[in-house]
Each structure stands twice: as structure tokens, then as C-alpha cells.
């Protein structure tokens, strides 16, 4: 391969790597895994196509043809066609961008570089390292290549050309090489190569054994006393940070802020008996804040025609009477046709009718009284008759209902 061709492949491979790394969702260590999967599938394809289409007959002829087929372009194409699933974007992209490398290995490098994974993924594309190594220079992971992180954690970037090499210790382990017990765990057994860590009592952050009296340090919210961790009552020491309409509820090692009862304005605990003050719509009955029944009042709360009051917790609501429904803000009979043409006085309520009646009679009587005062006997007689008629109307059953409706209001 000429110098210019090698340079082209190097630049082309670098551009491909940058393109793949820039794709959202692709992590650097994942590229090594993609390369490893590709190599695994290629090797499976090589195994599957070994001796393909040769099943007996002229042995000399078969040996000649087989030796040609073994490293033929036909066989390489058959292997490559099955190397990636159609839905595996990363694998197909890697294969597409590295066909030149695959051909170079297939035709020229196989015998001297039989390990395709090492040649392609480690040495050529520089995506992977041997197990127990990490980073651009394939440095040894903490704890050694044989047992990275002492077997109690995961070396960051292990087996790839990426990562920091820092040990991510498993639960219960800690330290730079995961050979210490984490906070909340104690050393149960240890030798030169193995460590067993077990959990402390739940209140201990550091301990020498599993018992509640073997604590060395306590978790937040607990106080160490004679080897035991005692719960701190944040509610009793006023260390809580609850809002004005919440109360403090102590828990093991902490506390909770819980909502006051809806009948309360400020409280010292749960329920209507722990209120500091009663909320609007409630009254204090002994020690409890109870709901005020606004509907049980001499003054009607619902002033609309055919409305009735329904008490609710801390308030009330106005609903239409039976066989009535609210239409256009008013309680109408269920048979009411909202599309029917309305008359001039259809929207006048009973209370408004009473007021109009009073105004009409008032004007008439005032006019008659003025004329009667001038000594006109005819108008005097009419005035007396009008007063008598008006009195008779108000004494009638209809007048009583109208007056009662007016006095009670809407």
C-alpha cells in the first residue's frame, strides 16, 4: 500500500470516528463494544462459510477451488453481508466506513495478524484496550489488570481507549481500589485479596459491628450516646422548617412537614382539635373547629328564584330546586325552552313585579290625593276607593305571597 493510500485511510478513519462520536446517544466506550460485536459477527460468518458449496467428489479439484474460495472476494462479501443487523445503525456505519480496512486484513493481514479484534479494534481504529486497561495508552486499572478495583468495583473505561480509570465501587465498598468498607458498613472479614463488608445498624454511619450499641458515628438526625444512636426530635427542639399552615411530625432520624386540617389557620398537630385558629367558615366548639352551616340561618343565603342552599365544608353553594336547572344563570323549569321567543316581561322576577306594583300604586294614590286635596268631591271619592282597593289587594292571598317574597328578599 502506497504512502498516499495509507494517509487517506488514516484521515478517512479519523473523520469517521469524529462523525460517529458526534451522533447523539453514542458514548465513547460504546464504540469499542460496537467494534467488538462487528468482529464477533465477522468471525461467525467466516466459520459459517468455511468449505461452503464443497461436499465431495474430485478431491484434487475441490482442494484447488477451496484454497481459492478461502480468501476470495466472493466469500468476503458473503461474510460482510451478515455482519450487522439491518436495524443496527452503529454497526452498519462502522462497517461501511471501514470496508478498506476489512479488505486489507482479509487479503493481506490475516496470516500475520490472525486476531481480527486486536488488529482492527485495538491497533488500527484504537477504540479498545485489553481487559483491565483503559485510556489512550491502555494503562493498567487500579488494583491491576487481573483483578481491577480488587473485584469490588468497575474500572471506568475498562477495556476501551476512553475513561478515567477511576474505580466505581459496588455497594458496601469504598476507597481508591475498593478495598475499604463504605460508610454504613463494617469489615466482617479480610485477607490480602478479599474483603467482606456487612451493613451497620440503620442509625450508624460508621460502626464496629451489626448491633445498635456498636456505632462509632451516627447518621444525620441521630445523636451518639454510649455507643448508641438516639433519634433527635427536631419537632421538640424547633429545628424544623415547616410552613405556617403545616405541623412538624418527628420520624426516625428526621421529620416531616404535614398539612394542617382544612379547618385550621395554623396548628400544633393533625385534626380539627389541634388548630391555633379556626379558618373562615368554621367556628370553635370547645377544642374543635367545626363547620358553620351557612344554610341554617335566618337570612337566606340563596336569593335567586327557585334556588336552595346546600352546606359544604367551610362554605355553601346554591343549587336549583328539584325539576329546575340553571340556564343563563337562572333556575328554569326543566321544560323551559331557551330557544323560544321571549316576551317583554319574561325575565322579570317575582320580587321585581312586587316593586313595580308598589311604584304604580304609589304614583296613582299620590295623584288622586293631590286632586282630592283641592276639594273635588269626585276625586275624593276615587281616592278613597283606590286606597280601599289597594288594602284589599294586599290582604289577598296573592298579595300575602308577594309581600312575603319581598320581605325575604331574593
From Swiss-Prot:
EC annotation from Swiss-Prot or TrEMBL: 5.3.4.1
FU repeats: 194-243, 254-301
Cytoplasmic side: 374
PROSITE patterns: ASX_HYDROXYL (PS00010), EGF_1 (PS00022), EGF_3 (PS50026), EGF_CA (PS01187), EGF_LAM_1 (PS01248)
Enzyme class: isomerase
Keyword hit for Translocase: no
Gene3D superfamilies on file: Hormone Receptor, Insulin-like Growth Factor Receptor 1, Chain A, domain 2 (2.10.220.10), Laminin (2.10.25.10)
Residues in compartment: Extracellular: 30-352, 396-410
Signal peptide: 1-29
SUPFAM superfamilies given in the database record: Growth factor receptor domain (SSF57184)
Coiled coil start-end: none
Transmembrane stretches, start-end: 353-373, 375-395
Catalytic reaction(s) noted: Catalyzes the rearrangement of -S-S- bonds in proteins
Function: Protein disulfide isomerase. Promotes the localization of acetylcholine receptors (AChRs) to the plasma membrane.
Name of the protein: Protein disulfide isomerase CRELD1
Organism: Xenopus tropicalis
